[in-house]
């Protein structure tokens, strides 16, 4: 929950010999608000995960009340900014459905939320079909494809 934590984590992983292009930094949309810091993270090659879509629409974050979270429109704006800088192949998105109350059955936004609400918003904001496809299909596929250790340079 500290804005410097992602870079500290990446430094530790790098010093341990990790291949940073296989690392996902989750919850960046609630941790990193400074675009210079986001750029520094992106330049490592790690995946940039904005995974709180549909969560905390008021911007209030109970785990750190001093932070005012982005809403979904702000998240999409940040994603557009990342795309403009050439980081499309590093972007991951999700909605962090970890509790029953987030399911549609219990009044939450549900699993369909990204396809029903966020993808159309991305298109309205000028994110191309190719870029949406890369974020929704290409990047998860690349991340989840096993890589033989000999093909995984440190």
Q: In which residue ranges do the predicted regions lie?
A:
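Active-site glycine- and acidic-residue-rich loops that bind
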Residues: 23-35, 55-79
């Amino acid at each position: 929950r500290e804005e410097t934590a992602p870079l500290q984590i990446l430094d530790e992983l790098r010093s341990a010999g990790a291949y940073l292009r296989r690392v996902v930094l989750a919850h960046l949309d609630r941790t990193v608000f400074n675009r210079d810091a986001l750029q520094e993270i992106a330049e490592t090659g790690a995946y940039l995960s904005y995974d709180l879509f549909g969560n905390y629409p008021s911007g209030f974050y109970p785990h750190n009340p001093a932070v005012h979270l982005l809403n979904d429109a702000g998240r999409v704006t940040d994603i557009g900014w990342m795309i403009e800088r050439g980081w499309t192949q590093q972007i991951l998105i999700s909605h962090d459905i970890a509790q029953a109350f987030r399911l549609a059955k219990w009044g939450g936004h549900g699993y369909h939320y990204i396809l029903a609400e966020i993808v159309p918003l991305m298109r309205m904001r000028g994110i191309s079909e190719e870029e949406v496809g890369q974020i929704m299909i290409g990047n998860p596929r690349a991340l989840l494809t096993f890589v033989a250790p000999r093909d995984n340079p440190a």
